[in-house]
Amino acid sequence: KLPDRLVEDFFAFFDVVKTPIAIRSSSLLEDSHYQPFAGIYSTYMIPYLDDKYEMLRMLSDAIKGVYASVYYKDSKAYMQATSNVIDQEKMAVILQEVVGTQYGDRFYPSISGVARSINYYPINDELAEEGTVSLALGLGKYIVDGGLTLRVCPYHPDKVLQTSEMEMALRETQTRFYALDLKNTGQNFSLDDGFNLLKLPVKEAEADGSLNYIASTYDPYDMVIRDGIYPGGRKVITFANILQHDVFPLAEILRLAPKYGQGEVRRPV
């Protein structure tokens, strides 16, 4: 049971935050410089509700679920593989607003990503120190779980290997995405932190109108992929309007963010 003294703080937090909330870990091992530990512990997301007591119940379950994930079989196996022990671990839990837009009974962002300041597999004109980014439609769990994302070097945003050939673009780009189910109020709370997430086909996002700046359209008659959304034809997640036509300065942001992060911690991030 969580301390009663936290209830008032949580209600004050609910009054300020009007979006879904992510409940995630922040531990000593996750901040380690010498081995990756991100994604080992659970991260839960809960919808925003008008009933603050229902939100408090969901939040309480999620916080306990995050702490409990330290003792899961997979977590302990990873600790052993990296020569760590549970006794050395210390953890805080962070509450963050989930970035995105509500579409009916689901909530998700148009863009999520994971950036690395070192590119271990540079190709063509890329340099290792230029870093690399994995981009996807929907919640970032799709990336963390190893989904088919778009690999981009922010210094060469117009040169994406996966979209360099039509057959490759159709075969090796994202076809599904994660969204938060706003109807699920945690009555079926599970140790699986994805219990209230929906894994949907990209065509569902097309119906939501969330692909305008991130998708291209495959024309089966002319056998080409055209940047932008057009009637008919399969929608391909290329981020072309953003990466190549600079509708939004994402490439510049992705050049600066890892650079600043690496400068602050004095190590690759």
Q: What positions do the PLM features span?
A:
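Conserved mixed alpha/beta core segments that line enzyme active sites in large multi-domain catalysts
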Residues: 1-269
